[in-house]
Amino acid sequence: MKIGDVEVRDDVFNVKVKKHVLWEVVKWQLAKRRQGTHSTKTRGEVAYSGRKILPQKGTGNARHGERGVNIFVGGGVAHGPKPRDYEYPLPKKVRKLGLKMALSDKAQNDAIMFVDNIDLGEQPKTKKAVEFLKNLGVDKETLLIVIPEKNEVLYKSFRNLQNVRVLLPEGLNVYDVLWANKLVIHKECLDRIYKKVEA
């Protein structure tokens, strides 16, 4: 299969796309991201005495024990959230298949571009980044740019653009690929992308 003038592997850029696999991988990614620091106090943790607030009989009021139970305002919460880890395992095969399918989806919709060079000079400039995207004709698109090596100038030039994310090939993931309308990939990244979906 060819994308522009670049020959790419069919087993990575032209596999059958199954939405359910993509959904599984995205769900797993978002679950891993969750902080899970939510917390509520139970009746044992709220700052109230455990004494009985009124006599059992004789007052005409309903029967009550302590003040910290969940039926009172300011009392504890019954079955409320506690800090927890939302991460769960997903087989590596499924993760790799998901990435292949995400890349294939973009390739089949002509949403991948390969470039020889992404050079924005010595100093980070958002203006230069916008010019670079305009020259490619993708300045209005939501973009994922894959670069071959860490480059502070590129990171800083693009980071002020809300519709652009910059990743190394090793950081390529299903969520970000699907988030973008178009992928701009440096040609030198291709072998490392193959390595990622095989490793």
Curated annotation (Swiss-Prot):
One of its GO terms (biological process) is translation. The keyword RNA-binding applies. Belongs to the universal ribosomal protein uL4 family. Part of the 50S ribosomal subunit. PANTHER family: 50S RIBOSOMAL PROTEIN L4 (PTHR10746), LARGE RIBOSOMAL SUBUNIT PROTEIN UL4M (PTHR10746:SF6). This is Large ribosomal subunit protein uL4. SUPFAM superfamilies: Ribosomal protein L4. One of the primary rRNA binding proteins, this protein initially binds near the 5'-end of the 23S rRNA. It is important during the early stages of 50S assembly. It makes multiple contacts with different domains of the 23S rRNA in the assembled 50S subunit and ribosome. Keywords: Ribonucleoprotein, Ribosomal protein, RNA-binding, rRNA-binding.
